[in-house]
């Protein structure tokens, strides 16, 4: 069954416009989802080709129907794969360089809203959280088999949760009696580990822990670093990378990676080399990230934490 992909894409226009799309260019949508960015890329690259990746089979199935015309015309290729396989998958299709790529990170609304996927702390389902449902590691395994130190480590590192140790201890204690099978059972366990003052604060008390487990299940941060590296290697001169993030861990990785590339070839200021001879390979097009307008946040509450960063290859 395909999920309902009728959701609002954050930074839809800005993410694609910042790629400065050429009509005959080669572009990649690294996170197909509901096809919002792919649709806009197709409208702008009328004589080019778009390659769209998603590891979620539901997204591929949905978009095969949505873009059946563009696929049959040979303007769009849908690739059922994780974006850490960019170079491998594109090379198989005889594509060795691209003019731009857009990443829309995090869980897509349909994944989050589909209760059976086990992503949400607001509905009850079996613990899962796999973006690629063919992989074996899921949230149930992490919660019920990982050692205390590993649980505490990911909750602290990926969830930035200061009560990580207490939550990990409570998980271990509860699963010794019986397995923690559902999202609701995990939420109850997390709440039991937190002090009352935290439970009465704004925001869901399980949000940080669920984020941490989801990141661990999908190895999101390592995958992101690898994908950014590959994307930068694929770019033609003048090609751009446009990345939308929704949480600080991802944004830090993107910011650091972009800054690293943009300053890579800068020489120490004391060296007597004229500026005209110093040529950076990449340049930042967003010294500060773009953030959503009030209207976008009102239209889509998940947009409030979104940031857009753009890098260009010289």
UniProtKB/Swiss-Prot annotation:
The Swiss-Prot or TrEMBL record describes its family as follows:
Belongs to the methyltransferase superfamily. RsmH family.
Q: What class of enzyme is it?
A: transferase
The record's subcellular location field reads:
Cytoplasm
**Tell me, what is an example of a GO biological process annotation in this record?**
rRNA base methylation
UniProt xrefs under SUPFAM superfamilies:
Putative methyltransferase TM0872, insert domain, S-adenosyl-L-methionine-dependent methyltransferases
Recorded GO CC terms: cytoplasm
Keyword rRNA processing attached: yes
Q: Which Pfam families match?
A: Methyltransf_5 (PF01795)
Q: Which reaction does it catalyse?
A: cytidine(1402) in 16S rRNA + S-adenosyl-L-methionine = N(4)-methylcytidine(1402) in 16S rRNA + S-adenosyl-L-homocysteine + H(+)
Q: Which HAMAP family is this protein grouped with?
A: 16SrRNA_methyltr_H
Write the Enzyme Commission number(s) for this entry.
Answer: 2.1.1.199
Entries under InterPro entries matching the protein = RsmH (IPR002903), SAM-dep_MeTrfase_MraW_recog (IPR023397), SAM-dependent_MTases_sf (IPR029063)
Q: Which GO terms describe its molecular function?
A: rRNA (cytosine-N4-)-methyltransferase activity
Going by the UniProt record, its keywords in alphabetical order are: Cytoplasm, Methyltransferase, rRNA processing, S-adenosyl-L-methionine, Transferase
Q: Which domain of life is it from?
A: Bacteria
The protein in question is named Ribosomal RNA small subunit methyltransferase H
Instruction: State what this protein does.
Output: Specifically methylates the N4 position of cytidine in position 1402 (C1402) of 16S rRNA.
Residues bound to S-adenosyl-L-methionine: 35-37, 54, 83, 104, 111
Per the record, the gene is rsmH
